[in-house]
UniProtKB/Swiss-Prot annotation:
It holds the Pfam family DBI_PRT. InterPro entries: Nict_dMeBzImd_PRibTrfase, Nict_dMeBzImd_PRibTrfase_arc, Nict_dMeBzImd_PRibTrfase_sf. This is UPF0284 protein M164_0030. Belongs to the UPF0284 family. It comes from Saccharolobus islandicus (strain M.16.4 / Kamchatka #3). PANTHER family: PTHR38811, UPF0284 PROTEIN SLL1500. It comes from the Archaea. CDD domains: DMB-PRT_CobT (cd02439). GO terms for molecular function: nicotinate-nucleotide-dimethylbenzimidazole phosphoribosyltransferase activity.
Length: 347
């Protein structure tokens, strides 16, 4: 049910944990054809806030429906909420820099939304804010927890992740995943190559040029936390791990990436080679959604969406605690059915 890579072990996950969802936006998501993490490019800026609202409330306030792809495939926040319903951990939303802020309580890192990486993603002032404040958050969480799970929501985040990995010296071109089964590799490559021109030599200035607020918020929270960390995400979390490694070469021994089989088995990406380069362990949930009653859920098995909002890590946490595949899929179907029945989802 869970596959282990590079020395990852599931036994460390059998303790109380807090779920941290770091949200933000990047104007890269407005580039047509780059992401399907929203019904239109403009709606991608609402996706992180709506994801956060749905995980906490079971409904969205920022938009009148949960985020969907242009073809109606639901957000992975649905999988996250279903998995966490069996555990009920503390859930904290962290705004690293979202264009639309959620209408729920959240912690603000005093960052800013990411701009177009082909010009300049973030100001140095905001980069420092995000890193310093997220480190402090991690330190405070250490007072209560020995384990945290960090998820992310930022449309076009795989593109900024690829730019970040390349800027830090990793062989990452064409190796990141996509929410679409048709990974727009040529467009991503073109955007990233343009972003990487005339890079400054200082690593922090490089991150300000091509990264995004979420990667910095995830990295900072991890750097401040004293216990074990499950980075719940796909190829984006290899970029977060790379940033962590820039600051503290010893930190990755306490960190594991928890993702989905759809990420590690993605033929159009190579998440495992990225994790190996960075030096981070990986766990993958083998959750099978082909038995779902709903086509929108079964679409995940065809390569749609794949990961996000901590879906893979949350499934791992549920499976480690004895929740069966069938039970988890029934819960996902139940939540999806409620959305369809209440007209909170247009399919």
């Amino acid at each position: 049910m869970i596959k282990e890579y590079y020395g990852a072990e599931t036994f460390i996950l059998n303790k109380d944990f807090a779920y941290i969802l770091v949200i933000g936006t990047t104007d890269v998501s407005l580039i047509p054809g780059l992401t399907i993490a929203g019904a239109t490019p403009e709606l991608t800026h609402f996706t992180p806030a709506a994801d956060a609202e749905y995980v906490l409330l079971g409904k969205c306030k920022s938009i009148n429906t949960i985020p969907v792809s242009p073809t109606g495939i639901p957000t992975p926040a649905l999988l996250t909420r279903a998995s966490l319903s069996f555990i009920n951990p503390l859930k904290i939303v962290v705004n690293a820099g979202s264009r639309i802020v959620p209408k729920i309580p959240y912690i603000d890192l005093q960052g800013e939304p990411g701009k177009d990486i082909r010009k300049q993603a973030l100001s140095m002032e905001k980069v420092n804010n995000i890193i310093e404040n997220s480190i402090k958050l991690g330190e405070e969480l250490s007072n209560e927890y020995e384990l945290i799970m960090i998820g992310e929501s930022i449309p076009a985040g795989t593109t900024t992740a690829m730019a970040t990995l390349l800027a830090l010296g990793y062989d990452a071109m064409d190796k990141v995943s996509s929410a679409s089964p048709d990974n727009p590799k040529e467009l991503k490559r073109k955007v990233v190559e343009e972003a990487l021109r005339n890079l400054p030599t200082d690593p922090l200035q490089r991150l300000a040029k091509v990264s995004d607020p979420v990667l910095l918020g995830v990295a900072g929270t991890s750097l401040g936390f004293k216990g074990k960390i499950l980075l719940a995400g796909g190829t984006q979390m290899t970029a977060a791990a790379a940033i962590i490694n820039e600051f503290d070469k010893n930190k990755l021994k306490d960190i594991t990436i928890g993702t989905t089989k759809w990420i590690v088995e993605d033929k159009f990406a190579d998440m495992l080679s990225l994790a190996k380069q960075v030096g981070v362990k990986v766990l993958a949930s083998m959750l099978d959604l082909s038995i779902s009653a709903y086509e929108g859920i079964r679409a995940y098995e065809k390569g749609y969406v794949k990961e996000g909002v901590g879906a893979g890590g949350s499934a791992i946490m549920a499976l480690v605690r004895g929740v069966s595949n069938n039970t988890l899929v029934r819960k996902i179907d139940e939540l999806y059915g409620e959305l369809v029945g209440s007209n909170n989802l247009h399919i």
